[in-house]
Amino acid sequence: MVTKRSLLKLYLLGIVTLGIYFIYWLVMVKRELNSLGANIPTCWLLIIPIANIYWLYKFAEGFVKVLKPGESAVLYFLLFWLVSIIMPAIVQSELNKLAERGG
């Protein structure tokens, strides 16, 4: 089941909690993507240097597999890594579209 979330609320909570909500959001989205067929490893890798880069790649790979089939996982990984502030907007927008379709 995909949860529709407000982008404004996502960013406001992320700012107010000094980024902690973004980590919570990543955990929730990872669970949703995995339930839809992605294979994203445990979020504990987020707190381990270097392993967090691997985790982000696997997240991008899962995002592409579930929501953007046929597109490049490497492109999304680089986008998420280099311009990380827009990553939640991209991912949540796609999840919201899926939720509206009933996915």
Swiss-Prot record:
Matching entries from InterPro entries are given as: DUF4234 (IPR025328)
**Where does it live in the cell?**
Cell membrane
Q: Where are the transmembrane segments?
A: 10-28, 35-57, 72-91
Pfam families per record: DUF4234
Q: Origin, by domain of life?
A: Archaea
Q: Which keywords accompany this UniProt record?
A: Cell membrane, Membrane, Transmembrane, Transmembrane helix
An annotated GO cellular component: plasma membrane
Q: How does it sit in the membrane?
A: Multi-pass membrane protein
Question: What's this protein's name?
Answer: Uncharacterized protein AF_1598
Q: Which organism is it from?
A: Archaeoglobus fulgidus (strain ATCC 49558 / DSM 4304 / JCM 9628 / NBRC 100126 / VC-16)
